[in-house]
Amino acid sequence: MADDNQNEVKDEVVADIAPFDPTKKKKKKEVVIQDTTDDSVGKLAEKAEACTASEGQESTFAGLKKKKKKPIETSILNEESGDAVEDLNERTGEDEEGEGIVLETPSYPWEGSDRDYTYEELLDRVFTILRENNPDLAGDRRRTVMRPPQVLREGTKKAVFVNFMDLCKTMHRQPDHVMAFLLAELGTSGSLDGQQRLVVKGRFAPKNFEGILRRYVNEYVICLGCQSPDTILSKENRLFFLRCEKCGSGRSVAPNKAGFMARVGRRNAGT
């Protein structure tokens, strides 16, 4: 009986198992696509409700007054900022002083007061305006610096003016005119040698030449109006004229005159 029962069970199992067919394909699982539009619509609805709720809260608190904030004391801040700006201006002014740049307009002592100004203050104001408009005339006068004359002895009766030509170039004057003035003032004779040195008869110290050259500069070189050495000496109709290239003024100067000439030669017995 047991064998019969086992055979029946096997027959049922074999009947349940279908024969394998390789031509049949497996069924694919269906992919379910979720619709996100419903979720987005729901989120938008929630945001709209939140906005309406907040507006309702604002409307409920509209009648209440807001607390006023205490005003900040700006005067202290303005003073501190003004001090900082002044410090910066002073520092920049100190930095720019070496370059000669004026950063601020000049302030006068009488500004902001009713007092009368003094003569010295007005004079300073005039010079500051002159320096701004014409610095060449109002600035410090350029001094004419000349080298001292180098004088050597030649023998016992002659003196040699070594740097005579250099001084003539410094003064911008002709050597003949300078030599004529020197010889007339010294009361002697002389000439230029092969090395362009002035050889003068007699014994003379460098101080003698220095004093004569100073008089020559004051008479034939320096302008009496602006004290400028940039002048031109010209001869017109037997007269010498000195014209300044800076201020344009002109004046006539005296010609060279021969000084006292001592007679050294022997006299005849009958004269």
From Swiss-Prot:
Zinc finger (C4-type): 223-247
Gene3D superfamilies per the UniProt record, alphabetical: 3.30.30.170
Pfam families: eIF-5_eIF-2B
GO cellular component, as recorded: cytosol; eukaryotic translation initiation factor 2 complex
GO molecular function: mRNA binding; translation initiation factor activity; translation initiation factor binding; zinc ion binding
Keywords: Cytoplasm, Initiation factor, Metal-binding, Protein biosynthesis, Zinc, Zinc-finger
Record InterPro entries: IF2/IF5, Transl_init_fac_IF2/IF5_dom, Transl_init_fac_IF2/IF5_N, Transl_init_fac_IF2/IF5_Zn-bd
Cell compartments where the protein resides: Cytoplasm, Cytosol
Record-level GO BP terms: cytoplasmic translational initiation; formation of translation preinitiation complex
Keyword Protein biosynthesis: yes
Entry keyword Calcium: no
Subunit annotation: Eukaryotic translation initiation factor 2 eIF2 is a heterotrimeric complex composed of an alpha, a beta and a gamma subunit.
Family: Belongs to the eIF-2-beta/eIF-5 family.
Chain's role: Component of the eIF2 complex that functions in the early steps of protein synthesis by forming a ternary complex with GTP and initiator tRNA. This complex binds to a 40S ribosomal subunit, followed by mRNA binding to form a 43S pre-initiation complex (43S PIC). Junction of the 60S ribosomal subunit to form the 80S initiation complex is preceded by hydrolysis of the GTP bound to eIF2 and release of an eIF2-GDP binary complex. In order for eIF2 to recycle and catalyze another round of initiation, the GDP bound to eIF2 must exchange with GTP by way of a reaction catalyzed by eIF2B.
Name used for this protein in its record: Eukaryotic translation initiation factor 2 subunit beta
